[in-house]
Amino acid sequence: MIEGVTELATPNVPPAPPSPSAMRRALRRARDGVSLNLDEAVVLLHARGDDLADLCRSAARVRDAGLESAGRPGTITYSRNVFIPLTRLCRDRCHYCTFVTVPGKLRAEGKGMFLEPDEVLDIARRGAALGCKEALFTLGDRPEDRWPEAAQWLDERGYDSTLDYLRAVSILVLEETGLLPHLNPGVMSWAEIARLKPVAQSMGMMLETTATRLFTEKGQCHHGSPDKDPAVRLRAITDAGRLSVPYTTGILVGIGETLTERAESIMAIRKQHKAFGHIQEVIVQNFRAKDDTAMRDAPDAGFDEFRATIAVTRLLLGPDVPVQAPPNLVSQQECLALIEAGIDDWGGVSPVTPDHVNPERPWPNLDTLRELTEASGFTLVERTSAHPKYVRAGNPWIDPRIGAHVAALTDPVTGLAKADALPVGLPWQEPDESWESAGRTDLNIAIDTEGRNTEARSDAALGQDVVGAFGDWDTIREQVRDLAVNAPERLDSDVLAALRAAERDPAGLSDDQYLALATADGAELDAVAALADQLRRDTVGDDVTYVVNRNINFTNICYTGCRFCAFAQRKGDADAFTLSTEEVADRAWEAYVDGATEVCMQGGIDPDLPVTGYADLVRAVKRRVPSMHVHAFSPMEIVNGASRGGESIADWLTALKEAGLDTIPGTAAEILDDEVRWVLTKGKLPSSAWIEVITTAHRVGLRSSSTMMYGHVDNPSHWVGHLRVLRGIQDETGGFTEFVLLPFVHQSAPLYLAGAARPGPTIRDNRAAHALARIMLHGRIDNIQTSWVKLGIAGTRVMLQGGANDLGGTLMEETISRMAGSQHGSAKTVAELAEIAEGIGRPVRERTTVYGRVDRRPAPIVPVG
């Protein structure tokens, strides 16, 4: 018992106490700095009296070690902010919440469904005048889904959703006041987080608890609240990590969870941070019962229980993750005990606005908070909404479009807030619409003569301060092991039965039958390949087709973190490059002179690329060569462009089509199974987003290819599932022109070098995958393309005799596979492609991008435009 501390009620879920020996052992392990397991964490949550004091000392030592390592020993941080309650409407019904209200009450109070823009700016300006640097936007989850009044309010002002409005007012605050938005809009999808990242320094959402029963059981605090499903909340936190968003989360203490559930919640957050390094702070918030709520009679969390939870959180998270407790939910004297328990951050404290979530608990005066902090032997220092290490790291954590805003308010050395800096509005805008060529622009040639300058991008491993570009490799290897456990077994009898069924109706098999074909080997595989070859002959004849084209990769600067990719580089790396629009147009003209009918343009996800950049590239090519077919931009690039432009996928694609885009590549698909996908990539779009982009493209009149990359951590069951998805899309839209098989090139791939992937597909895998594609896609997608870049001449010929009918293109340049270690060159002449087909006695025919016939034109004399 600490002198002067208010004794609160006992915990609402009385646990069975651990044995004294279990407590002694757990405390000893905490003192020794040993990693604690779940059982030990639960034991320590019971600590009281001398045991609690011992526990807190261990937690404080871990906290102090982290501060020392971060270069700011003896400091407690806080953010001077304003609280902007954008809307108090919500579709959830949490039993402890007084923040949320209903439309009738708002009308009775003379208030709108949302704050108007001028109301938002008034709050922000008052904060800016007092030196606040953070605009904390808090609001209910998707109120338009529950309340017609909210939907009407948004519609009348031209917004499709609450998140659209939040984006708009965030830009307004940046431009008019310079305050840095921290967004708390609740559960969001990957695409929604991506769309808001350019307007926010950080985001957050309390996990609250992983106790599913509090969501599923009637009468529990989260029952009837769709956004409080722990699985949904964890997915949103994961997506923020994939997108490198500095993210705040935390737990609520005393809302009906058991101590085991509480420990599980903390460990779930730890797992998230280990994988992505994005948890910038963890809030441990004690439940306070409020009048006019369903939980008004529930007891508050006991203070000793609260202290023990903070200490255990610190021990589980380690020295590098800030632990925060709100100073307004305890007495001033109790604040001292929170520091003793291991916190190193007070969170946002406002000199302007109340805590709208806990309006009955005013913020402490900042001078008082400083005195309390100093009484514990610490110095109170100001930060911005993103914690210092993310500010110092910059890209990909801080979007370039708010880079100037962040730089104006932060110290570049410490990453903390600049002393006495007053925010000033700055334009929120895209980079200049024109850009210059930079870096190793001759890589398209040099990759075949000189090779790479470096073997890995510079941000592959950034040390303890910030997790590297690919996330945590131990976590990834664990995911790969889980995938391996579920790999299917092969049974010869199943293969033969499936083969007989496929001969009768190739497109009508069950998934189990297709899986049997995909696992075939030996004589059975020969029979499957022979069937695929016969289906090819029946469908498209014996012609082997190709397109005369040029690949133009306009930049390899990318921060997405695809673990299979050796192409992506960080800006400033020795192999990084960007091509100007003029250079791209020049290359398109050169391709035209050499007989090309198509240019295929794809690039890395460079956050500094202008939002108009994609359309600018298309227009540049069309101005130079009006007849050139522009096949460009993967679904990942399209999502990136639409998100940054604040537009829908459909509107963005329509604008690109109007600029001259003809078709899009169906790349970035990899494997359309998120279990595999999240091993392959840290930040690329999820399967659902890929499907949305492709189906939307088809609907607006842009046809596409389809692809599958295989031979890494996948197994044949994933191929079947992937092809099943493509069949469904083709049945719906009819927009696929071809299916392209992309064997994984492993030599320089980070995933392989980390020991987490196979060394590419085997010959059996290649034959089975090509044959399976022909059989499963029969009657839906006629053209099956094989890759000479990845398989070489001999391998390509084998695939042409097992279901494939197309060679792809002449390419003229190819850097993606070559940087990954492919040894089969980056260009083929028409004669060389013809030789591949003639070597197996097949005729060859040039085609267009969409598989039309080509009428040869006379060679040009002068460039157009």
UniProtKB/Swiss-Prot annotation:
Taxonomic superkingdom: Bacteria
Catalytic activity: 5-amino-6-(D-ribitylamino)uracil + L-tyrosine + S-adenosyl-L-methionine = 5-amino-5-(4-hydroxybenzyl)-6-(D-ribitylimino)-5,6-dihydrouracil + 2-iminoacetate + 5'-deoxyadenosine + L-methionine + H(+); 5-amino-5-(4-hydroxybenzyl)-6-(D-ribitylimino)-5,6-dihydrouracil + S-adenosyl-L-methionine = 7,8-didemethyl-8-hydroxy-5-deazariboflavin + 5'-deoxyadenosine + L-methionine + NH4(+) + H(+)
Region (CofG-like) location: 77-409
Keywords associated with the record: 4Fe-4S, Iron, Iron-sulfur, Lyase, Metal-binding, S-adenosyl-L-methionine, Transferase
Annotated region described as CofH-like, given as residue ranges: 521-854
Cross-referenced PROSITE patterns: RADICAL_SAM
Sequence ranges assigned to domain Radical SAM core in this UniProt record: 76-320, 544-785
Cystine pairings recorded for this chain: none
NCBIfam families reported in the protein's UniProt record: CofH family radical SAM protein (TIGR00423), F420_cofG (TIGR03550), F420_cofH (TIGR03551), PRK06245.1 (NF004884), PRK07360.1 (NF005609), PRK09234.1 (NF006687)
Record HAMAP family: FO_synth_sub1, FO_synth_sub2
UniProt-recorded name of the protein: FO synthase
Lineage of origin: Bacteria, Bacillati, Actinomycetota, Actinomycetes, Mycobacteriales
